Structure formats: C-alpha cells, structure tokens
Amino acid sequence: MKKILVLSIMAICALTISAQLPNVKLQDINGKTVQTGEISNDGKPVIISFWATWCKPCLRELKAIHEVYPDWQDETGVRMIIVSIDQAQDVNRVKPMVDGFGWEYEVLLDPNGDFKRAMNVQNVPHLFVLDGKGKIVYNHAGYVDGGEEDIYNALQ
C-alpha cells in the first residue's frame, strides 16, 4: 500500500513538473536571446505555436488566428509566441514571411529543434496554451479549420 501511495505522489509531481515550460535558449527574429523558461505574461495566458515556413497547415492556422487575435488580446490579454522550427539554412525566410502576412506575433527561432524536442513536439503545427501561472492547459497537434474556437475556450 505504501508503494502505491509513493508511486502515486511521484506521478502527480512528475505531471506537475512536466506542465511547466522547459528552459531553452532561443533567439527572436531580431537576434535577441530569450530563455523559454522565463516566458510569462503578467498572469495572463500565453499561446506558443510551433510552425515552419514550408508547412501549409501551419500557415492556415496562423492566418486564422491572426483574424481573431486582436479580439482575443482585448478579451484575455493573451500573448502569442510562434516558434519557427525552420532549419538554419531556411531561417532567413521567417522574418519576410511574418512581415508579409502582417503578423504581430512574437517570433522565436528554433533551428536546432532544442525547444521542439524539450516540448515533445513531433510534427507541426503544434500549439500550446499556458495559463497565467505558466502551466500548460491546452496542447494540440495539427490544424483543422475552425480549431480557433478550442484555442479560445482554453484561454478562458
């Protein structure tokens, strides 16, 4: 009985720890260093979306969110961070694409896939919602038209 109790407590602790962001050093599209473990939003939610310039479903998802993002910001104060997994030779495509679409998201670069691996992201698009305390409350791989409603519900 004691073993079961100890194992249960260990499992709960592991789940709690894994619900926090791992700390990985990345750069934004302007060359500024960012520690992912320090990502926060003053008690408001954060969306982290892994994407790539060559990923058509990623682009559809980010364009769809772009349409509703100003409303989400007004209603929830959400902060949106998109993490490009484009490899080093393709990183120079990221900023022109973001600027071309008029996205006002924060953009981080993960050319070596360190943050992607730390978050156990297998494919893109892959989106996480963090609550105001930095805990992952929503985790979704892939994109389906209309999926923004599920994301919005996770922000509440």
Put a short name on every predicted segment.
Residues I4-L15:
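Sec-dependent N-terminal signal peptides
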Residues A19-Q20, K32:
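Boundary of Sec targeting at the N-terminus
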Residues K25-P45:
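A short beta-strand-turn-helix
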Residues G43-V46, F50-W54, N123:
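Short pre-active-site segment immediately N-terminal to redox-active cysteine/selenocysteine motifs
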